[in-house]
Amino acid sequence: MRVDSIGEGENAIIVLDKTPFYGEGGGQVGDTGVMESGSFSADVDNTTKNPSGTIYLHACTVKSGSINVGAEVSTAVDEERRADITRNHTAAHLLQSALREVLGNHVQQAGQLVSDDYFRFDFTHFEALTAKELIEVQNLVNKKILEAIPVTTQEMPIEEAKKLGAMALFGEKYGDVVRVVSAGDFSVEFCGGTHVKNTANLGLFRIRQEGSVAAGVRRIEALTGMGVLKYINGMSAVIMDVCSLLKIANPKAVVEGVQKAEQLIKEQQREINELNSKLAVAQIGQLFAGT
């Protein structure tokens, strides 16, 4: 339902004649931020686009004041969140190229979600990745980050892009002119999303999880930048808790400590089973003695 004005506490979709907000698309989530005009203030909770991609729809929650159709507003994108999303999107491109280099050119993108806290990448492959393959892929992406490769964007005719070997995004439809995002010659893809200026801006890359989502389709969840540090800190805290429980000073001895604890549990279970057997024999003896 179209309305001419909105006020405090109301939720609405606001359309602007121009916007700095990125509208959800290509697997990348939409931007958030704020919109203001005088006493009017609203949180932009999400940004999407109409089916043709020509109109940007800002899902807003009015925090104060009111506003009418035709009013001028100032906008501000949540830049920290956008930066996290941007790092993850470029990392998704590097990940696809790394997977193709490690596993083979049969790997094709089968979907993705790029958000601020992590990204997931679906791809065609016939079996689970081994621990060695996961480390190899992860190391290759981090190697490209350390190489500080400039990331460039260029619009060109689609046929020219195909000649360059640019990879297309799964499920996307393209016009005669496409936007190509390149990280040197390591990664060349059609893409309309946001990206860093240099692979070094990613900081770090870490695979969090790998699994199956369908027959012949695998999924990797991964992190970049501060997300990697938070993940490592969380894992370190768990390891230190385990060390404390096992009374181990050196974290490198955790595996040995767990193995010893497992062996102790097995021995105690064997002793319990022996005691139960002896108890059962004694009870049977008492039963017969009473007859």
Regions from the PLM with identified roles:
Residues H106, T199-T291:
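Terminal appendage regions of diverse proteins
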Residues M1-T75, E80:
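Conserved nucleotide-binding/hydrolysis modules and their immediate coupling elements
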Residues L57-T61, T75-R81, Y118-A128, A222, ...:
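Short, hydrophobic beta-strand segments
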Residues H106, D116-V213:
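Non-catalytic interaction/regulatory segments
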Residues Y22-G25, T32, I85, A131-K132, ...:
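Short helix/loop capping segments that flank catalytic or ligand/cofactor-binding pockets
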Residues P20, S64, E79-A83, H93, ...:
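A generic structural motif
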Residues Y22-M35, N68-F123:
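Active/ligand-binding-proximal structured segments within catalytic/core domains
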Residues V34-M35, A76, L94-V102, E136-E147, ...:
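Generic, well-ordered alpha-helical scaffold segments in large soluble proteins
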